[in-house]
Curated annotation (Swiss-Prot):
Domains (record comment): Possesses an unusual extended V-shaped dimeric structure with each monomer consisting of three distinct domains arranged along a curved 'spinal' alpha-helix. The N-terminal catalytic domain specifically recognizes the glutamate moiety of the substrate. The second domain is the NADPH-binding domain, and the third C-terminal domain is responsible for dimerization.
Domain of life of the organism encoding this protein: Bacteria
Record-given protein name: Glutamyl-tRNA reductase
Keywords, comma-separated and alphabetical: Chlorophyll biosynthesis, NADP, Oxidoreductase, Porphyrin biosynthesis
Binding site for substrate: T49, C50, N51, R52, S109, E114, G115, Q116, Q120
Additional facts recorded: During catalysis, the active site Cys acts as a nucleophile attacking the alpha-carbonyl group of tRNA-bound glutamate with the formation of a thioester intermediate between enzyme and glutamate, and the concomitant release of tRNA(Glu). The thioester intermediate is finally reduced by direct hydride transfer from NADPH, to form the product GSA.
Active-site residues per Swiss-Prot or TrEMBL entry: C50 (nucleophile)
Organism name: Gloeothece citriformis (strain PCC 7424) (Cyanothece sp. (strain PCC 7424))
Pathway annotation: Porphyrin-containing compound metabolism; protoporphyrin-IX biosynthesis; 5-aminolevulinate from L-glutamyl-tRNA(Glu): step 1/2; Porphyrin-containing compound metabolism; chlorophyll biosynthesis
Matching InterPro entries: 4pyrrol_synth_GluRdtase, 4pyrrol_synth_GluRdtase_dimer, 4pyrrol_synth_GluRdtase_N, GluRdtase_CS, GluRdtase_dimer_dom_sf, GluRdtase_N_sf, NAD(P)-bd_dom_sf, Shikm_DH/Glu-tRNA_Rdtase
Amino acid sequence: MNIAVVGLSHKTAPVEVREKLSIPEAKLEEVLAHLKSYPHIQEVAILSTCNRLEIYAVVTETEQGIIEISQFLSEKGHIPLHHLRRHLFILLHQDAVRHLMRVAAGLESLVLGEGQILAQVKNTHKLAQKYGGIGRLLDRLFKQAMTAGKRVRSETSIGTGAVSISSAAVELAQMKVIDICVCRVTIIGAGKMSRLLVQHLLSKGVSKIAIVNRSLRRAQELAGLFPEAQLQLHPLEEMINAVSVSDIVFTSTGATEPILNRSNLESIIAVNQSLMLVDISVPRNVDADVQQLEQIQSYNVDDLKAVVAANQESRRRLAQEAEGLLEEEVESFELWWRSLDTVPTISCLRDKVETIREQELEKALSRLGTEFAEKHQEVIEALTRGIVNKILHEPMVQLRAQQDIEARKRCLQSLQMLFDLDIEEQYT
């Protein structure tokens, strides 16, 4: 049995590949059930963000489990396996454990140290629990990774002043225009990324901001967070009209297909008009064919790398501090995992000793007579249980703490032989 992660990220695949494999939350239950139906996949969790798609799995046979996950991704994205493989990374056991902790700490993010990824890891764990994807191993791994992410943020300065995808998008737009303060800006979408866009635009002095969203109520909730700003709100039906009077448009929706394309833009863009589109969604909200229109400058999440680079160098030094903390968390998980091979023996020994305790207690109580037994049974029960627990406690602690695998195996074999234990192997 092994822990594996198969995935791709902004480091290994362009956005046009990542968007094909993006898994919306509404489809997650179905996808988790599908993956768990494979014969070699025992537990599974899926981390799907704009910059990565990673499938964490406990596999009963490593090679076959990897093949099953890779084949699933190929079929889901309609990408031939030989083409997809060049974009995939595959990590096993300790490398997979370390990778998730680095992800949770923001060390694998496009924006080094960004905080949003920890919330996304938490959500991955919550949904995998809700839909029955994870069991004992991945549950513990994700909890350890969340602890690692929190420690890195509280014990180092890596999260201080970190740029986000949204702030990088605003920086990019500011770099491309003469004066962003006078620009008319439209944001399509009203989620967390859009909230951050509004926040950063206001900090740059932008005052003409419109929000377009399918749910006007969500747009109103967003506007309520910025009472000092006079945000214009539009339903999705008015999207094209709002875009037509804008200088810059940011898109950040959960749409699975492009909502802006050459067809719906070319008729509304004047010959002398200039329009900038900044798409921070995956799958993309803006079709690549808009680049055929001369008046339009179009950017997506992959274009943010240059903006982020200037912020990265100072943060890399802080990341080195985080590495030591992460190794402590990796080691903690490894110790716990290695101790699992003691569980069947310890459980079996406890069951056997408990059976003996109950049998001997019953004999003793029958000899003491009914009146005495009824009056003192609870005391005698607690006494015998306490004796058993104290006798077993120290050997069990030492057995779990034994880090030498061969020495621990010899101890387990000795216990099994001396107490004639019939062990059903688990978690090997």
